[in-house]
Amino acid sequence: MLTVDQLEDKLIDLAFAEDIGDGDHTTLCCIPQDAMGKSQLLIKEDGILAGVEVAKKVFNRFDPTMQVHVLINDGTPVKVGDIAMIVTGKVRSLLQTERLMLNIMQRMSGIATQTNRYVRLLEGTHTRILDTRKTTPGLRMLEKQAVKIGGGTNHRIGLFDMILLKDNHVDFAGGIANAINRCHDYLKEKGLDLKIEIEVRNFDELQQVLDCGGVNRIMLDNFSVADTKKAVDIIAGRYETESSGGITFDTIRAYAEQGVDFISVGALTHSVKGLDMSFKACE
């Protein structure tokens, strides 16, 4: 399996290939090869900055002679007018890396900002915000990094690092007990040590899980606030609890106050607005 660094390198290479193709003809025709310059990253919207370390990799992978002076680090609150970094190098390199760097930093900063808003809503509770697999194909590692930068917690990275029995798994497996037992048989056969989480849709399924056991966490899918409180009381600390499904910015605090350990929010990544910023020539 590829490391995070290897995945980032492949993403950057692919992004340059799709953007530059056989050459940035606009830049090549009007900018001399030896022209040198400087550009600054200007913040145009309040939020949480994310993607600085990836941006440095973008510049250095394209042209190792580029010099990046970071003024504001990942995870720092920023406001309109802040200068986050200054980059010096060949003007051709500045122009050809500008859009990829902005695309990554705007999206990661938007996710970090959105995540931080949710996290601040839960201050004073023990509940942690989780992301989901509802990410942009190919960008998952970056988007999940942004969630962490914003103060959230990563759920499983993919299908390989945790067992999560959803409704379809249970239905196709012939029921909750069958699904859980098959998980344990499989993990033993393969010599794997993975946590098991199971989704329940109602109190009948919850009771079946409690009768069977053998899981680490129970996901309460589309439970109301009142039913969440009831379910948490029934589980009584025997397993970790997670609320999921239809939870909004307006309702998340109420769910946390019922005592769940985690709340997963797809909106952290699937419909986020990028943070406004620009990369302009400077003296």
Question: How should each PLM-predicted stretch be described?
Answer:
Residues 249:
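Cys/His-rich Zn2+-binding cysteine-cluster or related metal-binding knuckle/ribbon modules and their
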Residues 1-212, 217, 226-234, 239-242, ...:
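Acidic/glycine-rich phosphate/pyrophosphate-binding loops and surrounding catalytic core
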Residues 267-283:
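Short, charged, intrinsically disordered terminal tails
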Residues 221-222, 245, 267-268:
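Short secondary-structure boundary segments
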